[in-house]
Amino acid sequence: MTLVQKSKVTRGQKGEQTRERILVKSSELFAEKGFFGTATRDIAAAAGLQQPSLFFHFVSKQAIVDELLAYSLSRPKTFAGRLVKESGSAAARLYAYISFDTEHLASSPYDLTGIHQDGLLSMPDFREWKLAGNTLAQHIRTLIRQGHADGSLLPLDPILAQHMISGINLNTMRRVGYKARGKRGLPEFVADFILRGLLSNPRSLPAVQKEGRALLLRLKTAE
């Protein structure tokens, strides 16, 4: 590799590091001050940049949120869609989803709680992510309905149950903080807590745990 090529690689790496720092600092500001309360000059200052330099990496504040929403919603939506098509107990599949989503949020380098406030997904600029969020919610509701059909879950309103699941996950992150990789057992704790309230037979929890964890491992390995 020539000196010129090495220089280009170094600049590229620094650019990626700066972009990542902007995303991290933006997410923290959105969680603290909200989307509308955060100005691009605030983001630039937090990231150690001059405001014009920020726009070299992101053309707008919306572009930053787009990337954070993509991180927040894309993997969980895809994973939940796969679970809907899997066979086996719906309770175990729901357990696998809750564990996956909790781990996804807890291991995030970003504080994702702020981008799910301020009614952002109701804004026309974020319609793509509103649709993605709706699809994810529908997948969760389908799992719940499948649990009604196979008798593994109590016959609760699927919409209410889905909102409770989503709300518990987000509020858990607000409580424990993001970058919670050190919170060992958190995904299992949250999944256990939720399933205890949804199972038609609470005594089936150990079997649901075993099946759900095996399914989670298999699907994550295949990602």
Language model features with spans:
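Conserved hydrophobic residue
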Residues: 35-36, 153, 178
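Short secondary-structure transition hinges
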Residues: 102-153, 159-160
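Helix-turn-helix
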Residues: 21, 25, 29-63, 67
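Short, well-structured alpha-helical segments
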Residues: 95, 141, 158-166
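Hydrophobic alpha-helical connector segments
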Residues: 67, 81-110, 165, 210
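Short, basic, alpha-helical segments at the C-terminal edge of helix-turn-helix-like DNA-binding modules
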Residues: 70-77
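C-terminal peripheral helix-coil segments that are non-catalytic and often amphipathic
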Residues: 1-6, 134, 138-149, 174, ...
